[in-house]
Amino acid sequence: VNDFGDLNIDESLISSHDGQTISLANGCVCCSISNDFNQTMINLVKRIEQFDQVVVEASGVSEPERIMDIARLDPELSPSGIVVLVDAAEVQNNSTNSYISNTVLKQLQTAELLIVNKTDLVSKEKLAELEAWLEGLSPNAIQLKTSGGLIPAELIFGEKINDNFFYSKP
């Protein structure tokens, strides 16, 4: 669990926390706490027989490509792809916000899977415009439209379709 601030709010919201969740607070995985992240990944590799995959859910201000670069440092890890959750109603506004635009655009451009969420909150015309806009930013990314954040688990834990990403059609 990675929170940007001093308080690890997300960790406290996870009701099934069983001691197997690793918390990283007070910074972005790819920036100020990257050493903690590196050590955490090394520790996970040592326990690799306990699980098949590790999913890193980074904060909204993270740089996914830098996280992948960190994971690529260890020869025992094989990073499998960058998934970005897109708010269909807000992403274009966020992409022009002077505080977060660079981060938003970089996340979209490095994605291999764009999960376009909240599609029920935009018109069909807006959705078609958004789809074309995303295609221009990330032409090689797979786009999946959904609402309520509902996606099949196979999208994250599915079969490998190329050297970088696992995906199974629902």
Place the predicted regions along the sequence by residue.
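Nucleotide-state-sensitive switch-loop elements of NTP-binding domains
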Residues: 1-102
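Short internal beta-strands
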Residues: 1-2, 115-117
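Short glycine-centered, acidic/aromatic-flanked micro-motifs in structured strand/loop junctions
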Residues: 58, 117-118
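Non-catalytic interfacial helical region
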Residues: 66-71, 89-104, 108, 114-116, ...
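Well-ordered beta-strand positions
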Residues: 81, 112-113
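C-terminal accessory "lid"/substrate-recognition subdomains
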Residues: 106, 110, 121-170
